Regions:
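Disulfide-stabilized cysteine-rich extracellular repeat microdomains
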Residues: 8-11, 22, 42, 49-50, ...
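A short beta-strand motif characteristic of beta-propeller blades
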Residues: 4-6, 56-58, 107-108, 163-164, ...
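Conserved core positions of repeat-based scaffolds
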Residues: 2, 23-27, 36, 74-77, ...
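Short glycine/serine- and acidic-residue-enriched loop/turn motifs that recur at repeat junctions
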Residues: 1, 37-54, 87-104, 138-160, ...
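Acidic/polar residues in short coil/turn loops that connect beta-strands
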Residues: 31, 47-49, 80-81, 97-99, ...
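Signature tryptophan residues that serve as conserved aromatic anchors
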Residues: 35-37, 65, 85-87, 115, ...
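Conserved beta-strand position repeated across blades of beta-propeller domains
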Residues: 18, 27, 69, 77, ...
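Tandem repeat domain/solenoid detector
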Residues: 16, 30-33, 80-83, 116-117, ...
Length: 290
């Protein structure tokens, strides 16, 4: 019920930290070692087995990891050479290996280099950002998650190899994939959304029914956006002036507006106070006061 320090050199200069929904947690140490722990049902801890680990274990022997991610039941990371790796559950082809085979150890995504960062949703999609500002996605496409401007249809095919989201000026490390909603920040400070719009999760000030969706990126009102976090039908984002804004489901009061009504907001609404960081969880948000 209170924070406990983990073994290792996490606090003396870690490069990346990740926390999954049902999967593993982990971090890249300052020495380039990747360690994971937690649920390992689909091999998402990269140990070539399905054993649960309650303390950090090293992934392989490599010491050139740059960043890591944990999402749903899949994990992965980038290396200093710019290569991209993923492992764990692959039921929708989300690992990007051109197959539906689960992986219990790190497996390289294609042969490209220049990969910068990764984000992932609950279980069915991953998003990969390249250093050249291009954004790529894999996995389920039921609600248009892949941003390919395909009409809503249960028959929309998942993609097991990365496909590019339109545009070439996506900002590094500022992409977010939630339950069934996706967001991307561009270098010009504009914020874009696509996928499922139930509860107003995409911030479009429009239809908030459970059946509305956008299968290609649409701009969220406003400019000068600087960060975005989402998890389950709700999102929080910051602007360069230090203000923070929320939208989506408010059924549990998770939007921080001192009330549980309205139960949904379909356009960005400012949170009172001065904050340095806010992240979105499942029916909750956490933040640091400035």
């Amino acid at each position: 019920s209170s924070p406990k320090q983990l073994p290792g050199t996490w606090s003396s200069g870690y490069n990346s930290i990740a926390c999954g929904r049902h999967g593993g947690q982990g971090a890249v140490q300052a020495d380039g070692v990747l360690k994971l722990w937690g649920n390992n049902q689909y091999g998402q801890l990269g140990q070539s087995n399905n054993t649960l680990y309650s303390s950090p274990v090293q992934v392989g022997t490599d010491t050139d990891w740059k960043a890591c991610f944990a999402s749903g039941l899949s994990c992965g990371g980038t290396k200093t050479a710019g290569t991209l790796w993923s492992w764990g559950r692959n039921n929708n082809g989300q690992l990007g290996h051109n197959s539906l085979t689960d992986r219990v150890a790190p497996f390289q995504v294609g042969t490209d280099t220049g990969w910068d960062s990764i984000s992932g949703g609950w279980d069915g999609n991953l998003a990969f950002l390249k250093e050249n500002g291009t954004l790529w996605v894999t996995g389920d496409n039921y609600y248009g998650q892949l941003g390919q401007n395909q009409a809503y249809a249960p028959s929309n095919k998942a993609r097991s190899s990365p496909v590019q989201i339109p545009g070439t000026n996506w900002a590094k490390t500022n992409q977010a994939v939630g339950f069934q909603e996706s967001f991307g920040l561009k270098t010009d400070g504009t914020l874009w959304a696509w996928q499922y719009n139930g509860e107003g999760a995409l911030g479009q000030n429009s239809n908030v029914s459970n059946n509305s969706f956008y299968s290609s990126p649409v701009q969220i009102p406003g400019t000068n956006w600087s960060d975005i976090s989402c998890r389950y039908k709700a999102a929080v984002a910051s602007k360069t002036d230090g203000t923070w804004w929320v939208w989506g489901s408010n059924a549990e009061g998770q939007l921080g507006l001192s009330q549980a009504t309205p139960v949904k907001l379909s356009s960005p609404t400012q949170i009172p106070g001065v904050w340095s960081q806010i992240i979105s969880g499942h029916a909750a948000m956490l933040g640091f006061k400035a």
